[in-house]
Structures are given as C-alpha cells and as structure tokens.
Amino acid sequence: MDKHFIVIAEAGDFIGEQKLIAQHLNGEMRDGKWHMADGTVWEIIVTGVGAINVMKTLQDIPRNAQIINIGYAGSANYEIGSVVCVQEAKLNHPCVSYLEPELLLKNVPSAWLKSPAECLTSVCYSNTDFVLQSDYKDCVFDMELAYIAALGFENLVAVKIVSDNLSLHDYREVAAGVE
C-alpha cells in the first residue's frame, strides 16, 4: 500500500493549516485524515516550524512516500492569497554565494487542486527566521520546504499560499483568519 502524507508546519493550532488544505485541495477531511477526490487517503503530519522539527518528525517516513507540503509563505511581490505550486526549493542565503544542490520537486497534479488555473509556479526559499526583506522577486519564502526536500523524498510536491509581503504583522492577521 502506498503511503500518502500531507505535511504542515503549524506553529500554533492546527485550524489555520487545516483551512488551507480544505480551501485548496480536492477532497474532504474525515476521521483526522484527508480523503482526496481520487480516493487516496492522506495522513496529516504536523512537523512544527523549522529545520530541526522537520528532520525529527520526518526522519522515519519512507523516501518513496507521496508528500504534499502545504502552508503559508511570504513573498516580496506576489499578492496575499496567491497560490503557488513550488518547482524548486532552495535555502535563503542572501549574503553568501556557493553552489547548492538542486532540490527539484514534482509538479502538483492539477486534479489535486480545486483551482489549478490559479496556481503560480515558483521557487521557494527556506530561511531559519521570518524574512522581512529581500531582493528576490517572483518567489516565496518559508521555513521548512528546503529541509523536507533535502531529506530525499522522491515524490514531493508543495503548495504555498502567500500570507504576507514580508510583513510579520500581515502574516499573523492572515494566519489568524483576519483577511
């Protein structure tokens, strides 16, 4: 039997991230699991925020498991509420330059999304802290995806919802449902 996991990094309560799953993925929540419209059942894994939580939580998950990482992300120029299907994960190192491994992700199957036409494609930069400024445009910033990808999952896709334009205040309002 294939393993299917939706990975979220909820800092507070699970409701905000669960809302994202219901708003953007085809299916429904039943018995604490996500039932995709195609009949697959997805276990929800809450990692917590940041690299160490990701590694501790996901270390024993089979590398051939199907993983959907869904969550909030900041962006310098995408509108709040934009849906981004991530094609590549990178670490955010604005002050250093060295060759990093390519962390390419699979394409998000359009059948999994409620509104696939709305999904922008982009790079996601993972940072160890909230990003408040950046010269990078047409991308998103989170605190987990590059670390999830670096663990070597073969079937990883990611959907990010822009919560802020590099503003901690905006992020907190959107995450709390004050849109």
Question: Predicted regions: what is each one?
Answer:
Residues 4-27:
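N-terminal beta1-alpha1 ligand-phosphate binding loop
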Residues 1-3, 38:
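Short, Lys/Arg-enriched, disordered terminal segments
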